[in-house]
Amino acid sequence: MKKRVLAVVMCALMAGTAFTGFKDAGDDKELVLFTWEGMFPQDVLDDFEKETGVKVVYSNFDIDETMLEKLSMAKGGDYDIVIADDYILETAIQEGLAEKLDKDSLENIGNINPLYQGQFYDPDDEYTVPYGAGIPLIVYDPEQVDIDIKGYKDLWDPSLEDSIALTANYRVINGITQLSMGESMNEEEVDVIKKTGEKLLELAPNVRLIQDDNTQNALLNGEASVAFLYTSQVTAALAENPDLKVVYPEEGLGFGIMGMFIPSEAPDKDAAYSFMDYIMQPEVAAKCTDYIGYYSTNKAADELVNPDLVVPDDVTKGEIVQNVSQDADAQYQKNWTEFKAACD
């Protein structure tokens, strides 16, 4: 759980999936789904094929910037459905890469929880449908940590040297540093962001690893004793070790929404609408929510999902990382590059 101008992350592109999205004319009917790995239970995809005759071809990316770059290179084509984070949705819409939705083709659109509609990235809900929501949190092993962690600022405690696992979203990690300093996660002043970078460098000695996929494993296998995790990773960690302690940071929460959209030049828009509507069926939405471990954005599915994944009353009061100016984003990226180098 965000930028007017986004740098091309070449190393991420090299690491991304090799699937191009192109289909031979002789192939059976296919829908190309482009999102992170592990976002759908296989039986949901298989059942869609049984119901429609459309095979889902799953193409994954590692970070949102990889998705945007590939979709831009394809000029809004190659992929039929994309699921990505809120901030990148705004950029995709601004760059003309998202199809304006025909709501008449989405019978189940009324199942979406209004809490997640009318957001900054799509204020009139013209292009996107929420798929899940979350708040990244601190999780730690109380048997291995000598302090009582209450907020982001505690991550800087010297006793945590070489013990923290972080997710790899540069804006989010800059953002929690800003919250620890009493600043907004969406600060635009470059001089203030530079101070964020200085503070972030002070965290480097405490960082054991930075990775976006399965970050919780470092906590579970003992490589790290503290982790900053996405909602799904928190859920996975607690399922394996319920003795871990979850921290709702006292400085405030970050909050994010994942959304689905149909690319502007999607090869099969009819199949895309069918898939999007299928995913909004309560029973299907509940299966997806339980599988990915994010908060449900489908109010019709709430009574069917794990109660822990029904949105808490105040979760949407958290701050969402949003797009910032070119100069501000460049400084955030500079902070991140220097921080990662210091962690090596």
Feature locations, PLM:
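Mature extracytoplasmic/periplasmic domains
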Residues: 254, 258, 263-320
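General small-molecule cofactor/ligand-binding pocket signal
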Residues: 57-59, 208-210, 245-247
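Early extracytoplasmic/lumenal segment of secretory-pathway proteins
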Residues: 24-91, 217
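A ligand-binding cleft/hinge motif common to bilobed small-molecule-binding domains
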Residues: 89-91, 226-243
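Extracytoplasmic ligand-binding site segments that recognize negatively charged/polar headgroups
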Residues: 41, 78-79, 83-206, 210-220
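Short, low-complexity disordered leader/linker segments with a strong preference
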Residues: 1-31, 343-344
